[in-house]
Amino acid sequence: MLMYLLKYYPKILFIIEGTLVTLKYSVIAVILGLVIGMLLAICKVNKNRVLRLFANFYTSIFRGTPLLVQLSIIYFAAPYIINIKFNVFMAGVISFALNSGAYVSEVIRAGINTVDKGQFEAAEALAIPKFLIMKDIILPQAINNIFPSLVNELVNLIKESAIISMLGEMDLMRRAQIVSIETYNYFFPMLIAACCYYILVILISFIAKIIEKKMIVN
């Protein structure tokens, strides 16, 4: 192992640099997914039946089909369906965000349901607009309750983002594949990529625990 590290040090750095690409996809997608998830969750708890049906249908589609299929449709089929050609980055971010939004919506919906309904009724009795009730009273409490689940979604996105290598994006996985081919050694490059993913997950989990403790104190 040590001999390999010394011999292929530049190539190892080449693999590690892919961490930034992986993080870029994951962070942008989880932020967009959080926005989509919030909107869908609000639709799911809305009294309007059409909004509930739409949100549930959306969730069933994106949770019921593989992420790789969704990515392939957006990248390869979109030019024929909507006459728009997405580059690899846009296709990746869109597919990851849409998929993440479906899962996040269920997490947020569950969080909203954990908030005491009496708070909503009391706010309505004070004639507070429903939008402000949801924004200022319900959602902040729901986010506190579901923060660990949202962190898990980010962790899952980091690992699932490896499929973007199928489109040639130079992420961790793609760089490890290139080095594997160049060195005729598949074990060590993949091991290095796995270690990078693992370290990312550990760091994010550690930071999340610190944030969660501060949220509990506040």
From Swiss-Prot:
Its main location: membrane. The chain crosses the membrane at residues 25-45, 57-79, 86-108, 187-207. Pfam families: BPD_transp_1. Keywords: Amino-acid transport, Cell inner membrane, Cell membrane, Membrane, Transmembrane, Transmembrane helix, Transport. GO terms for molecular function: transmembrane transporter activity. PROSITE patterns: ABC_TM1. One of its GO terms (cellular component) is ATP-binding cassette (ABC) transporter complex. Residues 19-208 form the ABC transmembrane type-1 domain. It is a multi-pass membrane protein. It is found in: Cell inner membrane. The keyword Acetylation does not apply. One of its GO terms (biological process) is amino acid transport. Part of the binding-protein-dependent transport system for glutamine; probably responsible for the translocation of the substrate across the membrane. Belongs to the binding-protein-dependent transport system permease family. HisMQ subfamily. PANTHER family: GLUTAMINE TRANSPORT SYSTEM PERMEASE PROTEIN GLNP (PTHR30614:SF20), MEMBRANE COMPONENT OF AMINO ACID ABC TRANSPORTER (PTHR30614). This is Putative glutamine transport system permease protein GlnP. It comes from Rickettsia prowazekii (strain Madrid E). The gene is glnP.
